[in-house]
Swiss-Prot record:
InterPro entries recorded: Trm112-like
Recorded family membership: Belongs to the UPF0434 family.
GO cellular component, one term: cytosol
Name of the protein in its database record: UPF0434 protein BMA2274
Entry-linked Pfam families: Trm112p (PF03966)
């Protein structure tokens, strides 16, 4: 995943920050409790493709996608 791309991506619903979950290959929005898949290195930022997350789901300890 390109670090420059991660710096500019936001949640398409709330425009809030996304957190990169390297293990699950997803970008997670904690505010909306949605996870957007990353397929072949490309984030799929379509609400219809996002999955609902469960509160307390661990996110990659490397932290938010911003600032990388």
């Amino acid at each position: 995943m390109d670090a420059r791309l991660l710096e500019i991506l936001v949640c398409p619903i709330c425009k809030g920050p996304l957190h990169y979950d390297r293990g699950a290959q997803e970008l997670v929005c904690h505010a909306d409790k949605l996870a957007y898949p990353i397929r072949d290195g490309i984030p799929v930022m379509l609400v219809d493709e996002a999955r609902q997350t469960v509160e307390g789901t661990p996110v990659d300890p490397a932290g938010p996608a911003r600032g990388r």
